[in-house]
Structure formats: C-alpha cells, structure tokens
Amino acid sequence: MSSDEEKYSLPVVQNDSSPGSSVSSNLQEEYEELLRYAIVTPNIEPGASQSSHPKGELVPDVRISTIHDILHSQESSPVLSPRKASHPVMDFFSSHLLADSSSPATNSSHTDAHEILVGDFLVSDENLQKMENVLDLWSSGLKTNIISELSKWRLNFIDWHRMEMRKEKEKHAAHLKQLCNQISDLKELQKTFEISIGRKDEVISSLSHAIGKQKEKIELMRTFFHWRIGHVRARQDVYEGKLADQYYQRTLLKKVWKGWRSVVQKQWKDVVERACQARAEEVCVQISNDYEAKVAMLSGALENAKAEIQRMQHEKEHFEDSMKKAFMRGVCALNLEAMTIFQNRNDTGVDSTNNKKEEYGPGVQGKEHSAHLDPSAPPMPLPVASPLLPSPPAAVGGASATAVPSAASMTSTRAASASSAHVPVSVLGAGSAATAASEEMYVPRVVTSAQQKAGRTITARITGRCDFASKNRISSGLAIMGVSPPMSSVVVEKHHPVTVQTIPQATAAKYPRTIHPESSTSASRSLGTRSAHTPSLTSVQSIKVVD
C-alpha cells in the first residue's frame, strides 16, 4: 500500500519541481536584461547633447518610475496572482515563485516600451546606486520569500507525511487485527477439524471393531445352523418312521373295529327300535286322554256362555221395550204441559213475529247462524238449525241406543204429514259434580214443533242413570260381545219456560231449517253404531211434537 502511494506521489513532486527550474531561468533572463540595460551606452551627438539635456533630466525619473512600477508589480503580484493550492508541495510554487515568474514578463514589456528612451540617455552613478539598492532590496526580499516558502513547504510536507504515516499505520493496524482475527478463526477451525477427525477416527475404529465382532458372530451362527439343520433332519427321519408305524397300526385297528361294529349294530338297532316304539305309544295315549278332557271342559263352558248370552239378550230386549214406553210417556207429558203453559201467549207471539218478519224480510234467515253461533248470548237454550247431531264421545247405555232409532223413525213419519220440520237440539252442558261423583250426564233439549205457533218452545232435561255395581262381575265378558249394561230408570225433570227470547231466536223458532229424510236416517244410523260401540250414557234425540 505505501509503496503504491509513493509511486503515485513521486511524479506529482517531479511535476511540481519543473516550475522551479522555469522560475530560475526566468530570473536569470531578467537579470541579464537589467544588466544589459544598465551597461548599454548609447551614441550621443555632441550638438544635440545640450538641446537634449533637459530631456535627460527627465529620463531618470522615467526610469525610476518604471523600476518602482516593477517593484510594486512584484510586491502586488503574490496577492493578485491566482493560487492553485491543491497539494502542500504546490504551495511554495503557487504563492510567490509563480508570481515572481510572471513579473519579468510584465517588466520585459515595460522595458521594451521604454527601451528606445532609456537607451538614448546616459546612466549616472546615482542612478546606478539607486538601481543597486533596489536590486539588493529585491534580491533580499526574493531570498527571504523563497526561504520562508521553502520552510513552509518543508513543514507542510512533514505534516502531510505524518498524516499519511498515521493513516497508513491505522490501516496497517486494522489489517493486522483482521489478519489476527482470521488466524484465530482458522486456529479454532483447525481445532474443530482436529476434534471431528479424531471422532471420525474413533467411529471408524469402533465400526471396524463391531464389524469384526459381527463377522465372528455370523461365522458362529452359520456353523450352529448347519449343525441344527443336520440334527433336525435326523429327528425328522425318526419321527417319520414312528408316524408310519402308527398309521399301519391304526389301519389294522380300523379294519377290526368295522368288522365288530357291523356285527353288533344289527342287534343294537333292533333293541332300540322296539324301545322307542313302546315309549311313543305310551306318550300318544296320554296326550289323547288329556286333549279329550280339555275338549269336554271347553265345550261345557261354551254351552254355558251361549245360555248366558241368550239370557242377557232377552233382558236387553225387555229393558229396551220398557225404556221406549217410559220415554214416550215422558215426552207426551212434557208436550201437554208445554201446550197448556204457552196457550196464553199465542196471540202476542204471532203479532210480534209478523212485525219482525215484515221489518227484516228475507234477511232474517241469514242471521240464524250468527244467533246460533254467538258465544256472547245468555246461557239459555238456543235453537240450532243443524241436522241430527251425533252424540259426543261419552257413555251411551243400551236403552238409549234403542231410543235414538225410534225417535228418528217417528220424526220421519211425522215429516210426511206435517211441514217436514226437524227439531234442532242444543247441548248446553253437564254439571262437573255429577261427572265426578256419579256417572251421570245431563243433556238439556230444546224442542220446537213445526205445526205449533211461533214463540211456543219446550225445554226438557232428560237424565239417564245406570247401575254398574251389580254388573261388575260380568262387565268384562259382556264388553267383548258388545252388550251394554241395562238402564235402571229414566227421570224426566220439568223446567220453567224461557220467557226472554231475542228476535233471531224467535225467527229461527218460527222458520226452522228443513232436513231430508236421507240425512236424518244416515245420522241416526251413525249415532246408533257409535252408541253401540262406546259405553256412553248421553244420547241425542230428535223429538217431533204433535198438537
């Protein structure tokens, strides 16, 4: 590094030293010109010396002025000259020497201009002395300037050299430190490589030792297996001989056993067949006796059941007849009582209904459904224009099941002679205490007659009671055959007539909805079938009232 920098720095110093030689040559030329101008003695004519004397007096002043201008130009040139300070070596030449080198050119130009004038006059001793003094001053100033510049250049060069040496030392120290770090890293790497090589050597030695042991083991196993194979083959030969002997003996035993079995099997088969046949005959006789006893017992029970069924059917018919008679008596009594009660109000009812009919006209029938289905109506029996209603899912007795078809047939026969008006039934509800305490259902009926006058209604409550306590023993058997317990009694209660009646109710009572016989018979059939299959106490009847 340092040698390369010296190679690059030496040519610069040599190039800078070249202006020194040019400066010295310029100074020498300037001295020669000054000496030439000072020594030259011009040829002066004697006649013209006096006339030109006053001019000669003026010449030294001109020379002196020119010399002073030269000195001033020399002194001012270091300040005005451009500096090219780029290197410490160039400071000396750029400050004063280059300025001094430029001054002779200017002086030469001035001297050339005044060469003719100066050459025409004589140089006196005083002028020479002044010239000498000026030259001494100039030379001494030049000397001091050169020495000072050289000393400055020397000091600058020393400082620059020190700085360069310091930089080189720092670079050298950093490079040396880097090399030391690399050496330490290489040493550590060498140690790790040595350790790894040692481990590899150990692994190689252990593997070679293990391989040797494995080879020895393989040789031992080979010899052992060869011996074992020979031993197994010898044992196999012995075992095969034993198996052959055993097989031969077993075949002989099988032949002997087959001969003995063929002889013994015939006798044993006959004995077993006789024993099995005797046992089967005994079992068959015992089973036939048991089944005959069971058939006789079941046939007796069947005869008893048939007799019981016939007896209960006779009882059922008897109770149905009595129920029909009692029901018809109660209905007739209710009709007579109602007719006598409402006989006084016939005229008033007819007038009121006629007036309402004229006011509403044919729109009254459209209001029937609203009056029938109005839930805000007071709890009084409302006539509902509907076909024959089937009973709700409640218990219906045997007597009530027969009463419904009779009422339906009575309605159909009366409809042919009368106005064919069907009596609607409105179910208001039953008491909760009656359903919890005893098995009684109360179904109030609203009965209207098509042949009666308007405003005549009959309200009746029919209650049916059945006594299940005496029939608990046979209730389960009778339920299977579809026979319901008989009704014990029918109670017909009388109620006070309803005097408060709305206009739609009165209109519905006067003009009830007609029903075809087919729908009434189908409804009665469905009601009869349902009451026959469900053990219910509640029944819905359609009653036709005759005047």
Swiss-Prot record:
Q: Where is composition skewed (Polar residues) in this entry?
A: 517-547
Q: Which InterPro entries match?
A: POC5 (IPR033351)
Q: Does the keyword Phosphoprotein apply?
A: yes
Keyword Repressor included in the entry's annotation? no
Disordered as annotated region, ranges: 1-27, 347-383, 509-547
Renumbered ranges of Centrin-binding (CBR) repeats: 114-145, 203-234, 235-267
Going by the entry's taxonomy, the superkingdom of the source organism is recorded as Eukaryota
Q: Name one GO biological process term.
A: negative regulation of centriole elongation
* Annotated Basic and acidic residues bias: 354-372
Show the coiled coil region(s).
163-189, 288-327
Of the GO CC terms on this record, one is: centriole
Identify the keywords attached in UniProt to this record, alphabetized.
Answer: Acetylation, Cell cycle, Coiled coil, Cytoplasm, Cytoskeleton, Phosphoprotein, Repeat
Q: Which residues carry this modification: N6-acetyllysine?
A: K510
Quaternary structure and partners? Interacts with CETN2 and CETN3. Forms a microtubule-associated complex with POC1B, CETN2 and FAM161A. Interacts with CCDC15.
Q: Which PANTHER family match?
A: CENTROSOMAL PROTEIN POC5
Family according to the record:
Belongs to the POC5 family.
The record's function comment reads: Essential for the assembly of the distal half of centrioles, required for centriole elongation. Acts as a negative regulator of centriole elongation.
The protein, known as: Centrosomal protein POC5
Organism of origin: Macaca fascicularis (Crab-eating macaque)
